[in-house]
Amino acid sequence: MESHGSGLRRVLLLSFCVAGIWAAYIYQGILQETLSTKKFGEDGKRFEHLAFLNLAQNVICLVWSYIMIKLWSNGGSGGAPWWTYWSAGITNTIGPAMGIEALKYISYPAQVLAKSSKMIPVMLMGSLVYGIRYTLPEYLCTFLVAGGVSMFALLKTSSKTISKLAHPNAPLGYGLCFLNLAFDGFTNATQDSITARYPKTNAWDIMLGMNLWGTIYNMVYMFGLPHGSGFEAVQFCKQHPEAAWDILMYCLCGAVGQNFIFLTISRFGSLANTTITTTRKFVSIVVSSVLSGNPLSSKQWGCVSMVFGGLSYQIYLKWRKLQRMQKKKKA
């Protein structure tokens, strides 16, 4: 009876995590798409300063992580010093800026799909640079994802979707997304190196360090350089309060979503988190198609299914590998 109650609590907690991640990031996606395509006010101006979203997100997450550390930290030391994140902060500033800038050139569903193909640069780098040999099923996953994204990019986008874009340019948009993935790869590798050197580093320490440097770099880029558009972004928000509200909600969704991701990984592992976030991306495309008026053709839906079929198969392979490792430990 006790084990039944414990199992029920785990199911409820997992459901809570799924709902939290889906709600936070699906709504954040809606806001991101709104800010990149909507014409605000009577003058019908677009919010062209999308890099400002990254600065705002850094500031909110910096404050959020600091509060969480003060509330939940046990006061122990041994985590990575704040200055160790300076290099990861550079790539983590440039990568997301490219990803969000891509929304000027391609639709939100296209951006989500392109950014879902993270395994492609990882496997390319692994095989070409490090000589890693992958299994046939792993190559099959990559083929499905790469093929789906490529065919989606080559298919004709609806005129309604194109009319919403600030500067339609598919090659540039997809190029920015793949550069985003490349920079993300360097960021993840650097974070892994930091946590290996400082094992007592927790998720909040990483969030604080990354967003501290992200805030510094984005402040310099937006307000310190001659071509920086920080002041124009602030002025736009003053003239269009609804845009400022959307930006605030966008940032809060990111901070809350991180909370649920940390909770999911700590209680259920990274595989469960990968499954939840992958399905969330698929739902985000469906929501964008239905709510934001980005109609996809049957061929495009086939490409979407192909990509997420490959991602689902990858998750299954990871699950099988995890099961085999657990059996070896028991033996």
Curated annotation (Swiss-Prot):
**Induction info:** Up-regulated by stimuli that trigger unfolded protein accumulation in the ER (UPR) (e.g. DTT or tunicamycin).
Q: What happens when the gene is disrupted?
A: Lethal.
| Major localisation | endoplasmic reticulum
GO: which molecular function terms? antiporter activity; UDP-glucose transmembrane transporter activity
Entry keyword Transferase = no
What is the residue range of the motif Di-lysine motif? 327-331
UniProt keyword Membrane present:
yes
Q: Tell me which InterPro entries the record gives.
A: SCL35B1-4/HUT1
Keywords associated with the record = Antiport, Endoplasmic reticulum, Golgi apparatus, Membrane, Sugar transport, Transmembrane, Transmembrane helix, Transport
Q: Any idea where this protein resides?
A: Endoplasmic reticulum membrane; Golgi apparatus membrane
**Mode of membrane association:** Multi-pass membrane protein
Tissue distribution of the protein: Mostly expressed in flowers, and, to a lower extent, in roots, stems and leaves.
What does this protein do, in the record's words? Answer: Essential sugar transporter required for the transport of UDP-glucose from the cytoplasm into the Golgi and the endoplasmic reticulum. Essential for pollen development and involved in embryo sac progress.
The UniProt comment on domains reads: The di-lysine motif confers endoplasmic reticulum localization for type I membrane proteins.
The entry sums up its family as follows: Belongs to the nucleotide-sugar transporter family. UDP-galactose:UMP antiporter (TC 2.A.7.11) subfamily.
Additional detail:
Suppressor of the Yeast snf4 mutation that is impaired in sugar trophism.
UniProt protein name: UDP-galactose/UDP-glucose transporter 3
Origin organism of this chain?
Answer: Arabidopsis thaliana (Mouse-ear cress)
Lineage summary: Eukaryota, Viridiplantae, Streptophyta, Embryophyta, Tracheophyta
